Each structure stands twice: as structure tokens, then as C-alpha cells.
Amino acid sequence: MSSILLLTSSPRAESLSTPIAVELAEKLKNQNPGSFLVRRDLAASPLPHIDDLFTGAIRKPAEARTAEEVAAVKTSDELVNELFAADTIVISTGLINFNIYSSLKTWIDNVARAGLTFKYTESGPVGLLTGKKVYVVLTSGGVYSQGPAAPLNHAVPYLKSVFGFLGITDIETIYVEGLAFGPEAAEKAIDAAKMRVQEIALAA
């Protein structure tokens, strides 16, 4: 039995990253009978941005927090629990201004918590979320996986850095790119992504 956490972040009704990520998550679930699938639509149900109350609360032991502080970290605690429970995390995002959607960044801000998902030691920080797999479905109008525009792709390096900091190093990006290069190029990119989704599901 496994648990899959699906995070979709596109605000676009005609998003291409969302259906491909959903398809991957559903196929992984179907390949493993009894698996659980938890979905967070970060665009439709935006998470609270961290604020002064939140940052003060997470620096205290849980038993020392006021009722107001407990309420301030309640959603974050739920997100952290979902992340710990997941064996596989499927993420969808478009490349917006060379990075991820802000809704996904807010999720990261809520789950990257010292003492919970990582800790500091004498030899440096240690991630506490080990043994997990992350799939990132990344859409873009241009081509950013390689070529002259690749240095502008800050999304993938950022996600690898932050998840690596939390202890997750097994990360695969499924690029759906060149979507602005005409219908034929878009269709080719989508077909390639769906083929990779099928390969991943069959190997699960």
C-alpha cells in the first residue's frame, strides 16, 4: 500500500500541466491497489502565506503555543503530515517568469519547517523526508530543458534544491515544452509527456 500526494498549482482553466499530473497520479494509484491519493489544488484553494504570527509560533514547542498560534500553524501541520505520509509526490506547475507558480511556493513555505521536515546538526542541515519520489510536470511556451534558454529555467533547480534540503533527492521532471511553437510542436510535446507518464505507471 502506498500514498500519493498530488499538488496542482496552475490557475489556468485550460492548464496542460494539471491534466498530465492528474493522469500520472491516477495511473500510479491504479497500478497499486489499495493506494491512497490525496490532492491539493493550490490554485483553487490557496494556502495562507506565512506571516509574523506563524513565524513566531513555529519557533516555539507545540505545547507552548497560544490558541491563536496553534490556529496559525494548523494548516501547515496538516500539510506536513500529508507530506510525511506520501511515498510519491506528483507536482504540476507552469514556468512563470522563469520559476514556479506562487501557489506552489506558498506550499513549500508551509512545509519547510526546522525540526519537522529538516533539522540542523553540528555537521549541517539534514533533511527528514527520505525515501520519497517526486515527479514534476513542468509546462512552458518555450524550450527550457536545454539550449540557450536553459539558464533561465530556475524552477527545476529550485525544486531540486528545496526538496534535496528536505531529504528528497529522487526527482524526475516531465517537460511539456515548446507549447508556443505552434499546434504541431504542442501536440508532439504533449504526446511525449503522456508516453513518459505511461512508462512510469507501467514500471510502478
Curated annotation (Swiss-Prot):
Root EC class: oxidoreductase
Entry keyword set: Flavoprotein, FMN, NAD, Oxidoreductase
Top-level taxon of origin: Bacteria
Gene Ontology molecular functions: electron transfer activity; FMN binding; oxidoreductase activity, acting on NAD(P)H as acceptor; oxidoreductase activity, acting on NAD(P)H, quinone or similar compound as acceptor
Keyword Membrane attached: no
EC number: 1.6.5.-, 1.7.1.17
SUBUNIT field: Homodimer.
Name of the protein in its database record: FMN-dependent NADH:quinone oxidoreductase
